[in-house]
């Protein structure tokens, strides 16, 4: 069964094709092999954690490691950071456009809290600490984060900031 292409794998392939055309096929193969190995090593993770692993964490690690074959480590980090930042900007624009629909903005706080608790909860490997601040303000400190844990486990803790910066 073919894996669903993520934005990270799509952007990686675009970088390989545009910047390293002579090596693109080799880079894509290396990326695919590394991603397959990472997915196999993490196959026993919960369904909730798999959402983060498959969509962002593991493709990010595979792209970062593979890019280091053809560019310096810092450039590879900035390249992956650019992929994540581009998605964040696009998502922000889409949300901003939706909020122009009359009355929709009133629903956002409730939906945001509910979805955050679901997607970023303990089952996904997070340990959120909710801080009650009052006056309609909701704060969450993440005491444990699978993005940090997995990136550190695979020897690339610096990659975590790519994901954190997009929040």
PLM regions with names:
Residues 22, 40, 140-142, 163:
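Generic hydrophobic secondary-structure signal
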Residues 1-67:
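N-terminal, charged low-complexity regulatory/assembly segments
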Residues 45, 49-53, 58-61, 85, ...:
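Beta-strand-enriched cores of mature, soluble protein domains
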Residues 17-21, 72, 145, 167:
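Helix N-terminus capping/helix-initiation residues
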Residues 156-167:
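Low-complexity, glycine/alanine/valine/leucine- and proline-rich hydrophobic stretches
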Residues 67-156:
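Amphipathic interaction/junction segments at domain boundaries or subunit interfaces
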Residues 11, 32, 44, 141, ...:
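Acidic-enriched, low-complexity/disordered segments with a strong bias for Aspartate over Glutamate
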């Amino acid at each position: 069964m073919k894996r669903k292409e993520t934005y990270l794998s799509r952007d990686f392939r675009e970088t390989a094709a545009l910047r390293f055309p002579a090596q693109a096929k080799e880079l894509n193969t290396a990326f695919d092999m590394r991603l397959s190995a990472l997915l196999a090593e993490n196959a026993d993770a919960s369904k909730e954690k798999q959402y983060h692993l498959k969509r962002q964490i593991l493709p990010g690690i595979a792209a970062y490691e593979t890019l280091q074959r053809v560019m310096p480590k810092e450039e590879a980090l900035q390249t992956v950071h650019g992929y994540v930042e581009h998605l964040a900007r696009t998502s922000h624009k889409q949300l901003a456009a939706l909020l122009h629909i009359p009355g929709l903005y009133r629903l956002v706080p409730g939906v945001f809290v509910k979805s955050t608790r679901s997607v970023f909860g303990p089952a996904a490997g997070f340990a959120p600490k909710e801080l009650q601040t009052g006056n309609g303000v909701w704060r969450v400190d993440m005491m444990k984060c699978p993005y940090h844990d997995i990136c550190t486990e695979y020897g690339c803790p610096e990659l975590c900031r790519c994901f954190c910066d997009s929040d």
